Amino acid sequence: MGNTQPLPILITGGGRRIGLALAWHFINQKQPVIVSYRTHYPAIDGLINAGAQCIQADFSTNDGVMAFADEVLKSTHGLRAILHNASAWMAEKPGAPLADVLACMMQIHVNTPYLLNHALERLLRGHGHAASDIIHFTDYVVERGSDKHIAYAASKAALDNMTRSFARKLAPEVKVNSIAPSLILFNEHDDAEYRQQALNKSLMKTAPGEKEVIDLVDYLLTSCFVTGRSFPLDGGRHLR
């Protein structure tokens, strides 16, 4: 009994940045991990060598989403959690077909988690009261909106709403919550002027890094009561 292997945690978009940090966090805790990735970064090889199951996935179509779900269903009899981290970021730019922008944002942020939650539901159930989790990664703009990323904001708002609907559907076996970050970490190519402008948007004036997200994920996974809630990680930006 004491040597029973823990059920894996599924992380979509686990090949870089926050998804990668979460994958390593769980690996270091001897927690099995399944990671989806779109592009094969060198970091994927490191995860594989550390024992993670890494599955290349194309979430740009529903068929691609379901093909990934089938691979997960073949590989495990249960899941400890699903962390919906896969994301894309498109602006309404001159010349960009608006219908395509909206369709792309809805596909990755709405269709993908919606289909995966349904397809993998049976892997989350049957493990006890509040024993499994779904965490959706939304965005600070859900509250505020965005004049330059309207489709992106709308798709993340839909994902935020799905958090409450799936919480109602899956309780009490599965807790469903969302995390709504603003600036967490910079890209390597961000220049000093941009970084300062971005930092000034929050009261805390810092980019906290992946650990802030990891700590919140750990809290949600260990809670036996919290469900159907969105947790902002915005450094007080809503008060600016």
UniProtKB/Swiss-Prot annotation:
Signal peptide location: none
Keyword Oxidoreductase recorded: yes
GO biological process: one-carbon metabolic process
InterPro entries: NAD(P)-bd_dom_sf (IPR036291), Sc_DH/Rdtase_CS (IPR020904), SDR_fam (IPR002347)
Entry EC number(s): 1.5.1.50, 1.5.1.3
GO molecular function terms attached to this record: dihydrofolate reductase activity
The UniProt record lists the keyword NADP: yes
Function: Catalyzes the reduction of dihydromonapterin to tetrahydromonapterin. Also has lower activity with dihydrofolate.
Listed name of the protein: Dihydromonapterin reductase
